[in-house]
Amino acid sequence: MSIPKIIHYCWFGGGTISPENRKCMESWEKYCPDYKIIEWNEQNFDISKNRYVQQAYEAKKYAFVSDYARLAVVYEHGGIYLDTDVELVRPLDELLELPGFMGFQTNNEVATGLGFGARKGNSVVQALLRDYDALDFLKADGSADLTPCPERNTRVLQALGVRKDGTRQSIAEMEIFPAEYFCPMDLYNRKLRVTPKTYSIHRYAESWKPKPGAVSRILQRLLKKHYYTWYCPLRGRIERRLRKRT
């Protein structure tokens, strides 16, 4: 059984897809012309099926809704998921005979937003889904859990045997590829290194994030992933306390 020729993408919240992302999506039709493309949104995906997802949706943190939804639709239907800012540079057909595939980012975390695929009912995708079962998006203090899905998913994959070293490896029903296959653009400095092995480029449009000012851009470069997992939550707590005093 092959991975079906379906490309899934998520677009929750009803916003407009940017021209830059539309251009990326045009590459899907160019290199996968016989694939069915399905958009998943609040009209055809059950937000209430998972507490974490429902809380994230109500908080209008739609990227975190997609973190779960992409796993669910690939598990239930099979196929390939792509973020809207993923540009294909060659066909994906030769990946269809694998039971499943994912890729490392340049920081050696596995990221489903780069693009991943699997047959319906894939056991590794199921394990990633189950990790969300006991999670709340909202913490006890009312703040949001902004743990990025690559960090969360990679912990689960490590428990299944993945080595966080960026090398090609196989676990159960999943092939994990080095960054050059699906992530030739560096996560932090945005340098692009396309090779003959590259299938796609994740453009890191990050339309769900507020546009940073000069100070924030400097902090992002210095703190890297800790900017969103440590600095932003801390800043949010301080801002809430200040608002309560006014």
Locate each region found by the language model.
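Small-residue hinge/turn detector
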Residues: 68-79
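Glycosyltransferase-associated regions of secretory-pathway enzymes
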Residues: 1-66, 84-246
